[in-house]
């Protein structure tokens, strides 16, 4: 009973204190000084004004147009395209997986035919009127399930094909029949360049390989420094006189002798690049114009490099 009385008295005391406004026990207040506020994230303003309105750019009247066929410089020149499509046709085929990263391209022939492939690795050739000339597929069922990505180049007689499974082969460009087929130890991830009776391609080990068009035998190979983590970006190549130039997975630009594969020069383009960052690097195709090589990347870098010495 005594405990209940004590509890009741304590409760009355606390309650009476909470109602007290004169003693200052509960009413003591403190005024806060006005503090300055600063925005951490400032909204970006879109500029809608034109810069350098007085600058005039004069373009040549004559367009310089280089052929798309077996273009070993990746330089198509200044083309005038009206944007008009007079004839449009459609052909349905299986959607290509990972299309954006691997950037597969069409292959064109001298008689305006177009060559492409579908998600099963079938190669399809159309004439200039969109009529199907031939369709061929050399892959086995287990390979088709892997959705091979093909890369093409042709010299008017042979269609050279490499893929991301490590296969490389030659197709008769007129009939679509297989001439020879071989297997590389590593998948390919580059453009193909053809010169005379040879073709050149880079695989995922950053090895540039030179093969015979006639039978697919390897003539020479040239290795460069590589990264542990590989980018999905396709490697670009150009041919200049006696050398072939490409960029490896580290972002280095590499030039080798086109006859022997011996290193001529190697120029790094990335400073303190960690292996984990090489996966995100994406380079444009390298373009050769006279003695200069031009290319850019997704790190907001643009390069002009002398092809003679790097």
PLM feature segments, named:
Residues 2-11:
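Sec-dependent signal peptide recognition
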Residues 11-48:
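Bacterial Sec signal peptide processing site at the extreme N-terminus
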Residues 33-49, 53-89:
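Blade/loop signatures of beta-propeller domains
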Residues 89-108, 132-156, 178-196, 218-241, ...:
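Extracytoplasmic beta-rich repeat domains
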Residues 118-119, 163-164, 196, 203-204, ...:
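Structural signature of WD-repeat beta-propellers
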Residues 127-131, 172-176, 212-216, 258-261, ...:
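Short loop/turn segments that connect beta-strands within beta-propeller blades
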């Amino acid at each position: 009973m005594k405990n209940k009385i004590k509890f009741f008295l304590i409760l009355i005391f606390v309650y009476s204190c909470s109602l007290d406004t004169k003693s200052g026990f509960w009413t003591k207040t403190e005024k806060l000084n006005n503090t300055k506020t600063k925005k951490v994230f400032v909204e970006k303003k879109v500029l809608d004004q034109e810069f350098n309105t007085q600058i005039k750019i004069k373009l040549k009247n004559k367009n310089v147009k280089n052929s798309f066929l077996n273009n070993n410089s990746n330089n198509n020149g200044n083309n005038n395209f009206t944007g008009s499509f007079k004839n449009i046709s459609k052909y349905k085929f299986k959607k290509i997986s990972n299309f954006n990263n691997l950037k597969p391209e069409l292959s064109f022939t001298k008689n305006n035919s177009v060559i492409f492939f579908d998600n099963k690795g079938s190669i399809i050739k159309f004439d200039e009127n969109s009529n199907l000339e031939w369709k061929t597929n050399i892959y086995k069922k287990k390979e088709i399930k892997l959705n091979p990505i093909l890369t093409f180049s042709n010299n008017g007689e042979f269609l050279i094909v490499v893929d991301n499974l490590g296969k490389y082969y030659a197709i008769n460009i007129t009939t679509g029949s297989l001439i020879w087929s071989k297997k590389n130890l590593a998948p390919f991830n580059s453009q193909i360049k053809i010169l005379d009776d040879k073709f050149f391609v880079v695989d995922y080990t950053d090895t540039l390989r030179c093969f015979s068009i006639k039978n697919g035998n390897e003539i020479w190979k040239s290795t460069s420094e590589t990264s542990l983590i590989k980018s999905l970006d396709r490697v670009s190549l150009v041919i200049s006189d006696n050398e072939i130039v490409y960029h490896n997975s580290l972002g280095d630009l590499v030039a080798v002798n086109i006859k022997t594969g011996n290193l001529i020069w190697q120029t790094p383009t990335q400073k303190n690049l960690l292996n984990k960052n090489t996966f995100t690097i994406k380079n444009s195709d390298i373009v050769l114009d006279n003695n200069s090589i031009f290319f850019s990347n997704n790190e907001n870098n643009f390069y002009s490099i002398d092809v003679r010495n790097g």
